A protein has these predicted regions:
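N-terminal active-site segment of His-dependent metallophosphoesterases
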Residues: 1-53
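Active-site-proximal beta-strand elements of phosphoester/diester hydrolases
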Residues: 2-10, 130-136, 228-230
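Residue-level marker for buried hydrophobic side chains located in beta-strands
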Residues: 5, 34-36, 62-63, 131, ...
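Divalent metal-coordination and catalytic microenvironments
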Residues: 8, 39, 54, 65-66, ...
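Active-site environment of divalent metal-dependent phosphoester hydrolases
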Residues: 10-14, 42-45, 69-72, 139, ...
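Active-site neighborhood of divalent metal-dependent phosphoester bond hydrolases
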Residues: 30, 47-130, 146, 153, ...
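His/acidic metal-ligating clusters that form di-metal
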Residues: 108-133, 138-205
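Conserved beta-sheet core of the metallophosphoesterase superfamily
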Residues: 178-251
Length: 251
């Protein structure tokens, strides 16, 4: 089978469709599957269209991202916090509930649209030779700090039973910096890890010894040793990262 894997389209459905088309995706080919690595809606102007497009695909699997958690958290809370405004989450809720005048009206209206879309999302997809996650698999935290937002300079251990990690552990794993965690040797799955979450341009710039997002910025997938990064900073670049792999589902 051929898998078309993307991440972090953030409501830029046109860029997503263009990227899949350029990669050769054929919706009528039963050997073609689409796998999303999370963060589908907020920041872009077309969350409704993104939901409709992804929901229409007959063969797709959607991995949950940290921004997908954020929008559900805000709706459950009933009002936005500061990060909901800066991340575009609050605007996305309003886009999905255009007739609402208050957050009290907007949140339940948006939930009716988002809940069917998010309820089928999974924490990871495991193929015979690849594992697709939003950021990383759950790891054992050794310093007692449960937050995975900052991973540099911290110690972790590979968690052999990561497949059976708790909902809380998976939610935390969606925040880690995947390139840093890969550099710590924490992908001991024996398979190539494919992730989004963290813009590949940061790693390209680090490798090339330059300032990130300068005139040499690269918005494309990053192929490392045992891992592939997909996040092309779509809200900035207008590009969605897609890789095409040939693999099979686990038996």
């Amino acid at each position: 089978m051929k898998f078309f894997i993307f991440s972090d389209c953030h409501g830029f459905v046109g860029a997503l469709e263009d990227a899949l088309d350029k990669a050769g995706f054929d919706v009528n080919n039963e050997e073609h599957w689409v796998i999303g690595a999370g963060d589908y809606l907020d920041r872009g102007a077309y969350p409704w269209s993104t939901i409709r497009y992804l929901s229409s695909l007959p063969r797709k699997i959607l991995v949950k991202g940290n921004h997908d958690d954020l929008i559900l958290d805000m709706i459950k809370r009933g009002y936005p916090l500061g990060h909901d405004h800066s991340n575009g989450t609050a605007m996305t809720v309003m886009d999905l509930a255009p007739n609402a005048m208050t957050w009290e009206e907007a949140c339940p209206a948006a939930l009716k649209i988002i809940k069917p879309f998010t309820k089928t999302m999974v924490d990871y997809v495991e193929l015979k030779n690849h594992i697709i996650v939003h950021s990383f698999i759950p790891v054992k935290i050794l310093d007692g700090n449960e937050s995975m937002y900052h991973t540099e300079g911290r110690e972790f251990e590979y968690m052999p039973n990561w497949r059976n990690a708790s909902t809380k552990e998976w939610k935390g794993a969606r925040w880690g910096k995947p390139f840093d965690l890969c550099s710590k040797g924490l992908n001991q799955t024996g398979k190539t890890l494919i992730f989004g979450h963290y813009a590949t341009e940061h790693q390209f710039a680090k490798d090339e010894g330059r300032r990130d997002f300068d005139y040499k910025a690269r918005f494309e997938p990053y192929f490392g040793d045992g891992f592939i990064g997909l996040d092309c900073a779509t809200a900035y670049s207008g590009k969605v990262g897609v890789v095409v792999i040939e693999d099979d589902f686990m038996e």
